[in-house]
């Protein structure tokens, strides 16, 4: 499934552009801009599974660094600092990875 089957391509493009500068990523604003915040829990979990590149059932820190590329292949990677900030916000149980339920919570808190 492509991300554009769940989210509007123009919204994705605008959101990626808004956070093109290094160290500018704000997951709350990003999730709102791409329209993820308005989606059902089921659709948010579909987005999670697209972002879970290795299909482990979790988004690990390495995958998290490439989260923007999951929305648009030409997007930038997150910096180490941005990645760690996002992991800290999303990893509710402290196991070093974000599960589908944790991702849904992260989006709903945006």
Curated annotation (Swiss-Prot):
Q: Which GO terms describe its molecular function?
A: calcium ion binding
State which gene encodes it.
PVALB
Annotated residues that bind Ca(2+) 2 are located at: 91, 93, 95, 97, 102
The domain of life is Eukaryota
Name of protein: Parvalbumin alpha
The record's function comment reads: In muscle, parvalbumin is thought to be involved in relaxation after contraction. It binds two calcium ions.
Specify the species. Oryctolagus cuniculus (Rabbit)
Residues where Phosphoserine occurs? 24
Q: Where does Ca(2+) 1 bind?
A: 52, 54, 56, 58, 60, 63
List N-acetylalanine occurrences by residue: 2
């Amino acid at each position: 499934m492509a991300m554009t089957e769940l989210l509007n391509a123009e919204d994705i493009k605008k959101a990626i552009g808004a956070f093109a500068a290094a160290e500018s990523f704000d997951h709350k604003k990003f999730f709102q801009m791409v329209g993820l915040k308005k989606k059902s829990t089921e659709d948010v979990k579909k987005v999670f599974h697209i972002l879970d590149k290795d299909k482990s059932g979790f988004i690990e820190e390495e995958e998290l660094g490439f989260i923007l590329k999951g929305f648009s292949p030409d997007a930038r990677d997150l910096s180490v600092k941005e990645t760690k900030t996002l992991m800290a916000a999303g990893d509710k149980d402290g196991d070093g990875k974000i599960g589908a339920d944790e991702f849904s919570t992260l989006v709903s808190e945006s």
